UniProtKB/Swiss-Prot annotation:
Listed name of the protein: Sensitive to high expression protein 9 homolog, mitochondrial
Membrane topology, Mitochondrial intermembrane segments: 327-424
Topological relation to the membrane, as annotated: Multi-pass membrane protein
Keyword Iron appears in the UniProt entry: no
TM annotation in the entry: 306-326, 425-445
Topological domain ranges for the Mitochondrial matrix compartment: 446
Recorded name of the encoding gene: SHE9
Lineage of source species: Eukaryota, Fungi, Dikarya, Ascomycota, Saccharomycotina
Length: 446
């Protein structure tokens, strides 16, 4: 097989070299023809410039319609080609869409079938009741995390995975086949099978050729031997016996038969060699086509992977830009608002607590001040009473009277909300003085 591949590669290289030489010679010949045609057209243009100028009006009038019709026809052809390509693309899209939907339905059906089989197996398996004791006697609860439970869960998931793989095997095969159909690798696989069949046919043809060559050489040897025996008999023709005559006749017949067989084998060998050459040429062409198609397929897959990578990078870049320009500021504002809301709530709660504490403290202080004021008033009342009980001198009474005058001077007759404290003696003096003054005024008036 290695020698066969080596021969095939050498044959392909020779063909490529021959084709390259042919292309080179055709290129040189075409280039020479092109140069001569350029020179010829240049001379023709130089000689016919006046004719072009004289016929310019006719071209502008009559040729414009022709060019316009050609342009319209070209546009119509382009539209038809575009429509045909669009229809072909729509057909391919609908075909691949139906294949995708079919594969998705197959996957769903396979998963449902795997779940059904797994549920049936779990229902049939059961658990040994003697090995399922998990009660904690000291606390009355359930003992969890036993190794048997973990092992049961592991086995359950492994069996489920096996069911999924078994059920999805056909779906995966059909999906891979559909992918190969989409990418065109199925045709390459058919071409590989054709190459394998051609190699097998070539091997069979080589074995048949080898057998034919052996038979052809044997027929030649038989013919040579029969001719030698005939020549030996002809040399002693004068002394033939009846047996020699029979041998000569038989040898002559055998020689004719051997000659005919040799000719038939030669013809068959020539046909087989031509068939082998044809199969070899087909094999060379198939291998070259396979390498060429695989190269195109790999380039297409590589190009698709590169573009898909670029698309993913573009999507990631777009998402990054969207995230940085819109989502991150929105998230930041949302966090700031939430933080401000929390801070405001906490500050309001703290302010309410402080206000409540301040009100309680203020109430306590007012209560204490009220109690202190009451105590002071009681003490003052006791002092006044004690002073009233004591014998008073005229100087003391005169001092009280001066204090009353000072308080009266501090009072403003226009201010009705002013407050002043008077003790009992001062009130008595005030009433007495008012009575004396009023009596004096009445006497004066009367």
């Amino acid at each position: 097989m290695d020698t066969l591949h080596g021969e095939l590669v050498l044959g392909m290289m020779n063909r490529i070299v021959c084709r390259g030489n042919l292309l080179k010679s055709s290129f040189y010949s075409s280039s020479r023809i092109g140069y001569s045609s350029i020179y010829d057209t240049g001379s023709i243009r130089s000689f016919t410039s006046t004719g072009i100028l004289s016929n310019s009006k006719s071209k502008l009038t009559g040729g414009g319609n022709v060019d316009g019709n050609k342009g319209n026809n070209g546009n119509e052809d382009l539209l038809k080609g575009f429509k045909s390509k669009l229809d072909h693309s729509k057909d391919l899209f609908s075909k691949y869409k139906s294949l995708l939907v079919k594969n998705i339905d197959n996957v769903k059906e396979a998963i449902r079938e795997a779940n059904r089989k797994f549920a049936e197996q779990e229902a049939q398996a059961g658990v040994d009741s003697k090995l399922s004791y998990n009660k904690d006697v000291s606390t009355g609860g359930v003992i969890g995390g036993l190794p048997s439970e973990r092992e049961i869960r592991r086995r359950k998931w492994s069996r489920r995975l096996e069911f999924y793989l078994d059920s999805l095997q056909e779906t995966i095969f059909s999906a891979s086949k559909a992918f190969n159909d989409v990418t065109g690798y199925s045709s390459i696989q058919k071409l590989r099978k054709s190459i394998d069949l051609l190699q097998i046919q070539l091997e069979v043809m080589k074995r048949e050729l080898k057998t034919l060559r052996v038979d052809y050489e044997e027929s030649i040897e038989k013919r040579i031997n029969s001719q030698r025996q005939v020549n030996e008999l002809l040399q002693r023709k004068s002394s033939w016996s009846a047996t020699d005559l029979e041998n000569f006749t038989q040898l002559y017949k055998d020689d004719a038969t051997n000659s005919k067989r040799e000719q038939d084998l030669k013809t068959e060998l020539k046909n087989k060699e031509e068939a082998q050459e044809k199969i070899t040429d087909e094999l060379y062409s198939a291998i070259l086509t396979r390498y060429h198609e695989e190269q195109i397929w790999s380039d297409k897959i590589r190009r698709t992977s590169i573009w898909s990578t670029f698309m993913l990078m573009a999507v990631n870049l777009f998402l990054f830009v969207i995230l940085q320009l819109f989502l991150e500021p929105w998230k930041r504002r949302r966090l700031v608002r939430a933080f401000e809301r929390n801070v405001r709530t906490s500050l309001e709660a703290q302010a309410a607590d402080h206000q409540l504490h301040y009100e309680q403290l203020n109430a306590q202080l007012q209560e204490q001040s009220r109690l202190i004021q009451q105590e002071l008033e009681m003490e003052k009342f006791k002092d006044d009473k004690r002073k009233q009980d004591e014998p008073q001198t005229p100087s003391t009474i005169w001092g009280w009277f001066l204090q009353l005058i000072n308080k009266l001077q501090n009072l403003s007759p226009m201010d009705m909300n002013c407050q002043t404290n008077f003790n009992t003696l001062q009130i008595y003096l005030l009433v007495t003085s008012v009575g004396v003054i009023s009596s004096i005024l009445t006497t004066l008036i009367s």
